């Protein structure tokens, strides 16, 4: 058997940090403009997915991301899909409806605040944050969130 069969580094686009990164103020809004601070979710495994409706790879990965939220082996996972391009709530809602996204809500970044905080180079980008609030990995570009290698790896942080 291949020892590396479950090696997440085989999945392109995943960057695993040796030095965990801590961010002080990671704040974004829900669709009612209520502010959300990720500190409220310490103790949870967080996936912050940055996206826009015009982004084709974002559109491709969103359904598998939606399924990831209800994966029974990842009960501690919270997904925040954060729109970073100041699109109208109406446009974002219809994007979610068209793709049948049902397991998480859209969130909104104040004009590119988090894009700067996380030094995003493009979208989609997903930031993975452990139970202590530290970024331990990021996914630059899209992946298939149904990938069992990815899910098994993520379970180790759950």
What are these regions (language model features)?
Residues 41-44, 74, 101-103, 120-121:
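Active-site acidic short loop of glycosyltransferases
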């Amino acid at each position: 058997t291949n020892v590396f069969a479950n090696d997440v580094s085989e999945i392109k686009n995943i960057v695993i940090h040796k030095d965990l990164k801590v961010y002080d103020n990671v704040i974004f809004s829900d669709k009612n403009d209520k502010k959300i601070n990720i500190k409220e979710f310490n103790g949870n495994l967080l996936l912050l997915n940055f996206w826009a409706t015009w982004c084709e790879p974002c559109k491709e990965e969103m359904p598998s991301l939606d399924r990831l939220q209800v994966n029974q082996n990842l009960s501690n996972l919270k997904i925040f899909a954060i729109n970073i391009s100041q699109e109208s709530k109406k446009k974002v809602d219809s994007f979610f409806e068209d793709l049948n996204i049902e397991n998480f809500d859209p969130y909104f970044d104040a004009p590119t605040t988090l894009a700067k905080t996380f030094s995003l180079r493009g979208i989609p980008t997903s930031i993975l944050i452990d139970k202590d609030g530290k970024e331990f990995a990021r996914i630059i570009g899209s992946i298939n969130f149904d990938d069992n290698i990815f899910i098994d790896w993520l379970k180790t942080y759950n």
